[in-house]
Curated annotation (Swiss-Prot):
Keywords: Coiled coil. The keyword Coiled coil applies. This is Coiled-coil domain-containing protein 171. Gene3D superfamilies: 1.10.287.1490. Residues 1306-1326 are annotated as: Disordered.
Length: 1326
């Protein structure tokens, strides 16, 4: 018993020690595993972060490059627009010059036509005269024949001897009649030919003009063709831009293909990950980490998809911008067509097209601004994405902190589990049965276990697996619930983002509306300022008008007073004259013989004229007052309308502001409700998360039970993890080394294909050049080449031998490659055809010859042994040991860690490559090609030297099959030079033909001159017939001359027929050109229709501008009305001044008449016997009359007093007029200053309104105005008024000088001068 107890106690002690050792080992292993997992996760997170940053930087670089491209395109478009504007200006200048030249040519053609018409009329008159002369000659000839016949009948008996002579004369007569008839027929023919010749000459001139016009049209067509070439260049540039855009789209497609490839890789990795999860279901930490990585990859893929969508949106925007650019180009084409039609239209259409161009430029600038705004919005989106990335990084860091906390909690749970295990061991120690059982187990470790123990272990493991499966199912359910909650959260976040986007859109709309309000407020403020200025000016002008009205009233009062005084004076004068109170002594004066009736009549006439002038002045004053009242009423009405419009605008703005405030409040309420709903949902999700946390706590409790069983599996896992880590590191390094090589091989293959295509095109080009050279070569050269080919046929045998040698070399190389090949398979991508990778096995092959089925079996065995070789695994693990140590010891925060890791990776990769080179000895690294090319006496170099020799010999003997390109190009150049020389010769022939045509024209002119000479000869013949002295010789000479003329005319007709044929050919060409021009006109008509539609749209746009401009036009009309009022006031003042001058002249005339009466009385007193005393009022002198007034009676004194009072009144009036004139000059200076201010204001407004065309002003409604006098015609120009001359003094001076000689001439002329002077004021008053 003692022995048993001692043995039991020893066993228990040993068990405790072993359990403690096992616990320490487990702790160390768990800590190492945790650190390894954390390092792996950190490594992966850093890798993902680096990948994200690289992608982000690449996207930023691509966007910046796209923005730079767009800017360059915009700059190119602006440069093109400027060049097009310059071309348009040049074309317009050329069109103007062409028009002027065409107009001048048309004027010259009209002048020539008029000259030809005059010549035609002259020729017709000449023909009529010749016909009349011919008829008269015929009549005379008939009369003479009758006379001859009558004489012959009477004297038949007397002239029997002369019968023969008579017969001869009759025969001659018949001949002459025949010749005359023939001459008449020839004359008619010549007449017809002359008319036809005149018509043909006119037609030729018109055709020449038409040829000139055709030349001008050709020049215009050449200009149009140049413009078409410019448009084609534009098209080419657009196509280049489209190709660039296609390249960008290809790059994007490649990026999408790479993304698809990355997604495929991710799917493969996911599959591998699922396989590992199926193998290792018990590792929950790894499962959670993998799920987190899976979710992160999903999130990254979603981000990538969003970026792809954004890129697609940017592509659509670029496409839209390109479509807009194409539309702009089409609009520019239409404008070019308009320019072509503008060559035939007037200047008005040209101005309209210029206005359209300006509008299109504005639209182009607005579109550029829109594009810049879109680019800024894209930049904002990129900034938002970067912010989201930062937020995701923050969330990743928070998740890492939560993982650290969870691991700490797991360590705490492990400690609690160990404590529980200790407690269980103590409990087992307390129980003897459990201790015996455990001791029996430990004792019998070396022995094979019993069947019952195995069954118990199986039962326990099965129960444990059942519990684990239940826990795993519960965990899966919890994970599914978490996924659903996450999906809901994502949906809620998306809804929140959408609401935020809507908020941003609404804020943008609000900002846009605020900007519009600010613009309108600025417009209202400017309009208010302008109104204030206008009102201020109006008030000033109103005050000036009031002052002028007050001055007019004062003047009218003064005028009324003067008129009343004059009326009283005239009334008293009339009463005195009627009463006959003038008492003058007979020896001193002639008043006793003065007729009172004549004096009364003169005074009555003067008084009537003055009254009429006064009535007219009153009527004018009333008319002016009426006009002023109407204008003041209109100004008040305008003020009221302006105030009403401003009040309406203010009310509308207030209503809009109230609507905006209401909308803002509604939006705030809506978004507050939405935020409350989001908060409620967040609370719900927090409750769900708390429930999930409780479930997780329950799972952790179950996890504590599973930790005990994990200790057995961790030993196995440590080995597998080490192997996996080493394999993963080796695979990563090999993948990093393989993929760049594969990408380089892909790039080299694409370059090879491209170069092969270029070589093929170059060879085709060479063949085409050679075929052209052979086709264009002369027959002699071909014969020489055939002879040379016959001589040199033996050279083809050398080439055949060379081909056989090269085929043998290629077969030997293929044989060596097939023997040394240890390939397993070749991999080809699905979307990249023609690019593959060779996968080889590393085991050495036996070089024995086997049959085919044995070779296939051996290949399968070699592949199996290579894929499951332990040597390769050992080599990889041994080479990656150093790297695994560095990864295990690496700290993520230290800088030295990166350098150590890179150095370890280099060393491990070098070791791995060395060991793989030892394993894969069968595959030769260096090919035999380099050796063969390096050797000097190799077969390849020998063949190259032989080929060079054969080619040189072929060149020497000039074989056709191997003609170099230089010779073919030289032959082509020679042939092209020959063609150019032929063209030059053809042009010389054409010019010689033109010279021949000019010579033909000269010959035609000479024929015209000869025809004129023939007409002169005909006239001479007629005169010769009239003279009756026609001899036979002269008649024959005339006939010969006529025959020569006929021959010349026939030659001329032949030439004319040839010219007519040429003209018919030219007419046919003209008809062809006219048909082409008709087609062009149809196209132009279609373009005009499209332009009319564009004009309608532009008119619709212009209507809005016109509505805005109407207010300004109304203000301008008000200003013009005020100016008209001012000018009317000025005219009224002028009329008043003229009336005053007329009254003053009239009063002076009265004074002059009185002076004349006094002089006549003093001079004609001695000649009282004469009864020729008449009233001579216009000749009076105040000083002499005053000197003789003392000698008379009281009536003379009364007259003197009356005249003195009249002169005093006149002096007072003259002084008052001078003062008024001074005031008028002051008023005029003030008005001139106001006009200058108005002129400057109008110039500013006109400068602001110069962008609007003249048609806008012509369509404006101008109210009807009263007809102005001739002095107010220059109001529209706002010219400063000129200072009026003081014509009162000069007029009085002239009248005084003119009246003196009339008094000296005779006394009988006094009544006439009196009546003339009496009528003069009335004319001036009118």
């Amino acid at each position: 018993m003692n022995l048993n107890t001692s043995s039991n106690t020893g066993d228990t002690q040993r068990l405790k020690i072993a359990s403690l050792d096992v616990k320490q080992i487990l702790k160390n292993e768990t800590e190492l595993d945790i650190t390894d997992n954390l390092r792996k996760k950190l490594h992966w997170a850093k890798k993902e972060k680096l990948e994200i940053t690289t992608k982000h930087n690449a996207e930023l670089a691509s966007y910046e490059s796209q923005i730079a491209k767009l800017r360059s395109e915009v700059e190119k478009g602006e440069a093109l627009r400027q060049s097009l504007e310059y071309d348009l200006a040049v074309a317009r200048k050329e069109a103007g010059l062409g028009r002027r030249a065409a107009e001048e040519r048309l004027a010259e053609a009209h002048r020539i036509q008029e000259k030809l018409c005059a010549q035609n009329s002259e020729l017709q008159a000449k023909t009529n005269e010749t016909e009349k002369a011919f008829q008269t000659s015929q009549q005379k000839w008939k009369e003479e024949c009758r006379r001859f016949e009558h004489d012959l009948e009477e004297r038949d008996n007397m002239i029997q001897n002369c019968n023969r002579e008579y017969d001869l004369l009759m025969k001659e007569k018949s001949r002459l009649e025949k010749t005359l008839q023939e001459a008449l027929e020839k004359h008619q023919r010549e007449k017809n030919e002359m008319e036809s010749h005149i018509r043909e000459t006119a037609l030729e001139e018109f055709r020449l003009q038409e040829e000139q016009w055709e030349a001008e049209r050709r020049e215009l067509q050449f200009i149009v063709q140049e413009q078409d070439t410019a448009v084609q260049n534009m098209h080419k540039k657009v196509e280049k831009l489209e190709t660039e855009h296609m390249d960008c789209s290809d790059l994007l497609r490649r990026q999408t293909s790479e993304l698809e490839f990355s997604t495929q890789r991710e799917e493969r990795l996911r599959k591998e990950f699922e396989a590992t999860t199926l193998r290792v279901r018990k590792l929950e930490e790894n499962i959670e980490a993998e799920r987190a990585a899976h979710l992160e990859s999903k999130f990254n893929s979603e981000i990538i998809q969003l970026r792809i969508r954004d890129l697609e949106g940017a592509l659509q925007v670029e496409k839209a911008s390109q479509a807009e650019a194409v539309a702009d180009l089409e609009i520019i084409k239409n404008e070019f067509k308009e320019v072509e039609s503008a060559y035939e239209r007037e200047k008005h259409n040209a101005q309209e097209s210029f206005a359209k161009l300006n509008l299109l430029e504005k639209e182009y600038f607005s579109k550029n601004k829109k594009l810049n705004e879109d680019i800024e919005e894209q930049k904002k989106v990129i900034i938002d994405l970067s912010k989201r990335l930062q937020y995701n990084e923050k969330s990743c860091s928070e998740l890492q902190e939560e993982l650290v906390m969870a691991k700490k909690h797991q360590a705490f749970l492990v400690e609690t589990c160990e404590n529980n295990v200790k407690e269980l061991e103590s409990i087992l120690d307390s129980f003897t049965v459990s201790g015996q059982w455990t001791s029996g187990i430990h004792k019998d470790k070396d022995k094979p276990p019993s069947f019952s123990v195995v069954l118990e272990r199986l039962r326990r493991t099965l129960t444990d697996y059942q519990n684990k499966l239940e826990d795993a199912s519960n965990e899966e359910k919890a994970c599914n619930e978490l996924d659903s909650t996450k999906q809901k959260i994502d949906s809620h976040t998306k809804n929140i983002k959408e609401l935020q986007d809507k908020l941003a859109d609404v804020n943008k709309e609000l900002s846009h509306l605020h900007t519009k309000c600010a613009d309108r407020e600025a417009l209202i403020s400017t309009l208010k300022v302008e109104l204030q200025n206008v009102l201020h000016c109006w008030e000033k002008e109103k005050a000036q008008a009031a002052q002028s009205e007050s001055e007019l009233q004062k003047l009218s009062q003064a005028f009324h007073k003067d008129a009343e005084e004059k009326l009283t004076f005239l009334h008293t004068l009339y009463q005195h004259l009627v009463a006959g109170c003038v008492l003058i002594k007979q020896p001193e004066g002639m008043l006793d013989k003065f007729s009172w009736s004549e004096l009364c009549a003169v005074l009555q006439e003067n008084v009537d004229a003055l009254i009429a002038d006064l009535n007219r002045a009153n009527e004018k004053i009333r008319h002016l007052e009426y006009i002023c009242k109407n204008k003041s009423d209109t100004m008040r009405e305008l003020q009221q309308t302006q105030e009403d419009t401003f009040t309406k605008v203010a009310e509308q703005i207030k209503a809009q502001e109230s609507c905006w405030h209401r909308q803002k409040k509604e939006l705030e309420l809506q978004y507050s409700e939405l935020f409350l709903e989001v908060q409620k949902r967040a609370q719900k999700f927090q409750e769900i998360a708390e429930k999930n946390m409780e479930k997780l706590n329950h799972i952790e409790k179950s996890h504590e039970q599973l930790v005990l069983e994990n200790s057995h599996f961790k030993k196995l896992l440590s080995q597998t993890q080490r192997e996996q880590m080493s394999l993963l590191a080796a695979c990563a390094l090999m993948a990093g080394a393989l993929y760049p090589l594969y990408s380089r091989s892909c790039a080299l293959s694409t370059q090879r294909d491209f170069l092969q295509e270029q070589v093929n095109t170059f060879e085709l080009f060479k063949l085409e050049i050679r075929t052209l050279a052979q086709a264009l070569s002369t027959v002699e050269e071909k014969k020489q080449e055939e002879a040379k080919m016959k001589k040199k046929t033996f050279k083809g045998l050398i080439r055949i031998f060379r081909k056989g040698v090269i085929a043998v070399l290629a077969a030997n190389r293929l044989k060596i490659l097939g023997q040394s090949c240890a390939s397993l398979f070749t991999w080809m991508e699905s979307f990249k055809e023609g690019i593959g990778m060779l996968v080889c096995t590393g085991e050495p092959q036996d070089k024995h010859k086997f049959p085919k089925h044995q070779k296939e079996q051996l290949r399968c065995l070699q592949a199996l042994s290579w894929l499951t070789s332990s040597d390769l695994l050992a080599a990889i693990i041994s080479s990656m040991a150093e790297l695994q140590d560095v990864i295990g010891k690496a700290d993520p925060n230290s800088r030295i860690c990166g350098h150590l890791l890179i150095g370890a990776a280099k060393n491990s990769f070098a070791k791995l490559m060395d060991k793989i080179s030892l394993v894969m000895e069968c595959i030769p690294l260096h090919s035999s090609r380099s050796i063969t090319y390096v050797e000097k006496d190799s077969l390849v170099q020998r063949l190259a030297h032989g080929l060079h020799k054969v080619n040189t010999l072929a060149l020497k003997y000039g074989l056709r099959g191997h003609v170099p390109i230089t010779k073919s190009t030289a032959s082509l150049q020679k042939q092209i030079l020959g063609f150019t020389q032929r063209l030059h010769a053809a042009e010389v022939e054409r010019r010689s033909l033109r010279l021949e045509v000019t010579e033909f024209k000269r010959s035609v002119n000479e024929m015209k001159k000869e025809l004129d000479k023939a007409q002169g000869l005909q006239m001479q013949l007629n005169e010769f017939k009239q003279s009756k002295l026609i001899t036979h010789e002269k008649f024959e000479s005339a006939c010969e001359e006529l025959n020569n003329a006929l021959l010349r005319e026939e030659q001329a007709q032949m030439l004319l027929n040839e010219q007519a044929q040429q003209l018919q050919e030219l007419n046919y060409k003209l008809e062809l050109h006219s048909s082409e021009e008709a087609d062009k006109n149809q196209t132009l008509g279609e373009a005009v229709k499209s332009l009319s539609e564009a004009k309608m749209e532009l008119r619709r746009k212009d209507q809005s501008l016109r509505q805005l401009n109407r207010h300004l036009t109304q203000l301008e009309q008000d200003k013009r009305r005020l100016e008209e009022n001012i000018h009317d006031a000025e005219s009224a003042l002028r009329m008043a001044a003229k009336d005053k001058e007329c009254v003053a002249n009239h009063m002076r005339a009265v004074e002059n008449t009185l002076h004349k009466v006094r002089d006549q009385i003093s001079l004609s007193w001695s000649a009282a016997s004469r009864n020729d005393f008449t009233l001579q009022l216009p000749k009076l002198h105040l000083e002499t009359f005053a000197m003789e007034g003392l000698k008379g009676g009281p009536e003379v004194v009364a007259c003197q007093a009356m005249i003195k009072s009249f002169m005093d009144v006149y002096q007072l009036a003259s002084t008052r007029i001078m003062t008024l004139e001074k005031e008028m000059t002051s008023h005029r200076s003030h008005i001139a200053a106001l006009k200058s201010e108005l002129h400057t204001a109008c110039l500013r407004e006109n400068a602001s309104l110069q962008s609007i065309g003249s048609r806008d002003h012509s369509n404006l409604s101008i109210p009807s105005r009263a007809p102005l006098p001739a002095d107010t015609t220059g109001i529209g120009d706002f010219l400063p008024l000129k200072a009026e001359l003081d014509t009162t003094y000069t007029f009085l001076k002239e009248t005084f000088i003119n009246t003196v000689p009339h008094a000296l001439t005779s006394s009988h002329s006094s009544p006439v001068t009196m009546s003339a002077n009496a009528n003069r004021p009335t004319q001036i008053g009118l």
